[in-house]
Amino acid sequence: MHDAAALHVVEVLLVIGMAAWDARPLLSGEMARRFPRVFWTAAGLIIAIAVAALLAAIYAPALLHLMIVVAVALTSAAAWLGRVNYGRSRGLPPGSLSLQASIDALFDRSFYRNSAAWLGPVFKTLQFYQPTVCVVGLDRAHTLLRTYEDALGPSVQGFSRAIPQGFLRYMSIETHGVYGPMFRRALSSRVVSHHAAAMALAASRVLGDAARKADRAGGVLPDPYLDEMIDEAFLAVLFGLSPDDPDLPQLKSAYAPIARLHISSRPTPAVLAALAGVRQVLTARCARWRALPDAEVPICALSEFAKIDAGMPDDTCLDNLVFIYRISTMNVAGLLRWVLAHLAGHPDWISRLRAELDAETPSDGPALADRIVMETLRLSQAEYLYRRLRNDIGFEGYVLPKGWLVRLCIWESHRASDNFPEPDRFDPDRFLRDQPRTAYMPFGGDRHACNGVSLSNVICRVFLEELTRSYTWSVVGADAVEREFRHWSHWRPSRRMRLRLEPRRDAFSAAGQPARSQA
């Protein structure tokens, strides 16, 4: 009897030990700090398994034996899949499909770069609990996108299900062939540049607010001021809305549930109702504009659709505009945070930009503010593209299986020394020279590439020029980087980053006001 009890104790410990071993990547202190819900769910599962094993040992020893078999099978399968050479006989790329690899990618910004150096430019890993082929090198990415366009489908986020025919970047090739050209025209540089002066006024106003509230020793958190200026710019360019537009409160009220939706989540009935409410506001605006002379209709993306086609904008156009507003405001704010962080470490570029603005002499090639934004996109903001394989394909000597994700590693590819000498150095002047299409791809590289290039660049340029022209400024606390949300989100500078700014007494803002009056 004592021997049987001792055996049961060993069996219980074996079940608990294997469960804890399999879940160990989820039980680290880093997981507890960054993702407490995941940590405590994993810990709770281990406790539940321990309790079940103890009860089985007391009341159902046969069930305990079954638990051991299942635990051994799961642990063995995880170890087998985690081998770097797993699938070599089937032609799969090298790399581990272990949970540990997925967690490493979550916490280590250099994971993909280091993996490519070790395994080669095409390798496999596990992401979102799904097997993924990673491709480093934009020449390879372009070849893959061009050669296997029909075999590469979108990796669709949940919010796209709320939109008839889907979000622009997730549309089928045929559907995108209809809507893509319309959005390119609706978000053209002509439409965006019409709002540049208003953007400068908005930047001047929010920076004045920041300067009044800044503690000269510690500065202010830049996020609220970036968000306000960017929000105003997107509302104007997308919908023709100014801060005093009578439609704005109604649109904001209807939009509130959409603002709370995480883009990976399926839309709830409340979100669908909110989308219908926003659509109603925008449709009413379009109806009023049709009764106006062309000269009185605001120039914006919404009004451009009716010029393209009398039957537009339809629900697909309207819903896409709403979610472009939802997603892109956050992305542009992230880009501007990175611009500030990079310049914080390279104040000589701030001095150069101020000298260029004060002299009012055009650069040879893109303006310095534009080059700073382009270099920031290369070094930090542009990170990845995802596609999903519809069919098995052969690429670079490997088999890429149907159903797997493909991650095109943009951040790592932008740091290739064969395209960018000293690739880790911040050097906006490298964009005085045209970069080959296969070397620089911050907004995507196929027919689904982002249409908001002009809008993003103009917002960032206007803000940066207004800040530098009118203020003496610096940034502190920007050294650390962290995740914005989860595995699929962008990295960002530390949330502790603060902006210090004081008005330049001899400067005038883009709005034509003395900078001193803003403080």
What are these regions (language model features)?
Residues 101-120, 360-396:
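Conserved cytochrome P450 K-helix E-x-x-R motif and the immediately C-terminal K′/meander segment
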Residues 431-476, 481-495:
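Cytochrome P450 heme-thiolate "Cys pocket" and heme-binding signature region
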Residues 2-131, 365, 507-519:
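N-terminal targeting/anchor module and adjacent flexible "hinge" preceding the catalytic domain
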Residues 329-356, 453-470:
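Cytochrome P450 catalytic-core helices
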Residues 274-335:
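Conserved cytochrome P450 catalytic core segment spanning the I/J/K helices
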